[in-house]
């Protein structure tokens, strides 16, 4: 049995667009935290790869190749969809502005690597970088 650690699942219909439209703030760059992402389609493919090729008692980080801070992610989504970037606030001010659950989410920092996924499961991601996926999604929105 393998364990998949999958933070930050996104897809075309799982983006923080409403959050950006609402103007929900993000951490100031000096306080910003690292975050990890995986496209839902890549996660599904990774589940199958782990089922068929995963080694027993292994933990696989189900993340893409993007190294990005959370505020940078929100900025990239805003840029791709021509939305305003979120205001950036220092930690103390952000804590006074958002709910405790949102604050907890926005201050958790993770930096996971997917080398084991690539090496052992031999999975080539369809969406290796968040920015590439966002450009594709934005192009689809313009055609709709």
Language-model regions, residue ranges each:
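Glycine-rich "substrate-gating" loop/helix at the edge of Rossmann-like oxidoreductase active sites
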Residues: 7-9, 30-40
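Glycine/proline-rich active-site loop of Rossmann-fold NAD(P)-dependent oxidoreductases
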Residues: 8-23, 28, 49-60, 66
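Short, glycine/charged-enriched secondary-structure capping and boundary segments
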Residues: 16-21, 75-77, 126-127
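Residue-level signal for the nucleotide or nucleotide-sugar donor/cofactor binding architecture
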Residues: 38, 68, 112, 128
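Mid/C-terminal beta-alpha module of Rossmann-like enzyme folds, strongest
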Residues: 44-102
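Conserved C-terminal active-site "lid" loop/helix of NAD(P)H-dependent oxidoreductases
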Residues: 95-124
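Amphipathic terminal alpha-helices
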Residues: 128-144
């Amino acid at each position: 049995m393998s364990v998949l650690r999958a933070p930050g699942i996104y897809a075309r219909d799982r983006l923080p667009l409403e959050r950006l439209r609402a103007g929900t703030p993000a951490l100031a760059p000096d306080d910003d935290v690292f975050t990890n992402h995986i496209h839902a389609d890549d996660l599904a493919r990774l589940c199958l790869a782990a089922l068929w090729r995963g080694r027993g008692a292994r933990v696989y980080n189900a993340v893409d190749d993007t190294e990005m801070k959370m505020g940078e992610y929100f900025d990239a989504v805003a840029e791709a969809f021509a939305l305003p970037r979120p205001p950036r606030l220092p930690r103390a001010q952000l804590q006074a502005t958002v709910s405790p659950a949102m604050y907890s989410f926005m201050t958790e920092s993770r930096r996971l690597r997917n080398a084991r996924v690539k090496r052992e499961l031999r999975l080539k991601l369809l969406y290796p970088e968040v920015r590439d996926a966002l450009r594709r999604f934005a192009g689809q929105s313009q055609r709709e």
